[in-house]
């Protein structure tokens, strides 16, 4: 009975009553109270778990993140949820403010019930992954050289991994972290300690999109390093709404020779051929998929044309740089 391996029965209450000179009813009542407390405890624990789960789901898309493998604790338990909250926010009880951002965001698509919270969680995870990186001291001059030669990387056979390697060599972290639903993020730039980081979400998993996002985030680092302690999270579908974004767009366009591409492409607007596209690519020494992406972005070429030039960027990136 003491080890909870045998229940109290009417027969055992009679024996206990005789042994301790008490009534059998007293033992029956004690057992009834004990069983009731056990039920109440289970109900209380179930109620707590239901509440904790509900609050956790308000902050982030739990099912999606669990599927991605982002959690290290069992989020089906109260203990696991509290441990994850502490890992993400630094405090298991913290409730992030819904009306404030700990980062600069460029977005037009917006869901007031989810976007702020989910973007904040995504950013916290980006920093968690960044903390695991070991980088040399940031070399701004080295990054400026990379930026100056950005177009030449697009032409290299393994240009994507080459530029990632060169970024790391000059103290700039890079990794892929997929976006979360309702965040609409393409990329981000932020600093951790004295090192800048670039994160690519591969929301639009195309080679041209990779180079656009990379050029934009490199521009943020070169132009707005002091602002990146808060982080810049970018939805490239949206228009630049702040001075920082306008400046980063202008710098990225310069790095990718956007004006020159548009000048050459506009004259063929109504009769574009693959040969003409490649001529522009060769004359400006920038990969044809990037030229195509720029001309499609500015609606000079329809999206459905030259689909053979569209390739996955993520498939070209070494697995060590893909975090989740």
Spans of features found by a protein language model:
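Active-site hotspot residues in diverse enzymes, especially metal/ion-binding acidic/histidine motifs
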Residues: 1-324
């Amino acid at each position: 009975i003491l080890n909870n391996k045998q229940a109290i029965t009417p027969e055992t209450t009679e024996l206990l009553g005789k042994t301790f000179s008490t009534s059998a009813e007293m033992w029956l009542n004690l057992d009834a109270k004990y069983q009731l407390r056990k039920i109440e405890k289970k109900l209380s624990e179930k109620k707590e778990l239901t509440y904790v789960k509900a609050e956790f789901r308000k902050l982030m898309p739990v099912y999606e993140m669990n599927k991605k493998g982002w959690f290290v604790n069992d989020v089906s338990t109260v203990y696991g949820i509290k441990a994850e909250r502490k890992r993400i926010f630094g405090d298991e009880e913290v409730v992030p403010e819904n009306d404030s951002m700990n980062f600069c965001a460029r977005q037009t698509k917006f869901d007031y019930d989810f976007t702020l919270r989910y973007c904040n969680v995504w950013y916290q995870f980006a920093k968690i992954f960044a903390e695991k990186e070991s980088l040399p001291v940031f070399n701004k001059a080295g990054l400026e050289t990379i930026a100056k030669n950005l177009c030449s990387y697009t032409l290299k056979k393994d240009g994507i991994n080459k530029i990632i390697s060169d970024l790391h060599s000059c103290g700039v972290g890079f990794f892929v972290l997929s976006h979360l639903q309702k965040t609409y993020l393409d990329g981000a730039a932020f600093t951790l300690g004295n090192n800048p980081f670039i994160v690519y979400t591969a929301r639009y998993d195309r080679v041209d999109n990779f180079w656009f996002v990379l050029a934009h985030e490199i521009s943020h680092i070169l132009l707005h390093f002091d602002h990146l302690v808060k982080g810049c999270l970018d939805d490239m579908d949206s228009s630049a709404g702040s001075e920082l974004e306008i400046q980063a767009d202008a710098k990225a366009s310069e790095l990718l020779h956007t004006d020159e591409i548009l000048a050459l492409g506009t004259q063929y607007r109504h009769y574009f051929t693959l040969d003409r596209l490649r001529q522009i690519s060769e004359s400006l020494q920038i990969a044809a998929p990037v030229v195509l992406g720029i001309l499609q972005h500015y609606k000079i070429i329809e999206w459905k044309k030259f689909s053979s030039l569209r390739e996955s960027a993520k498939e070209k990136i070494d697995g060590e740089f893909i975090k989740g």
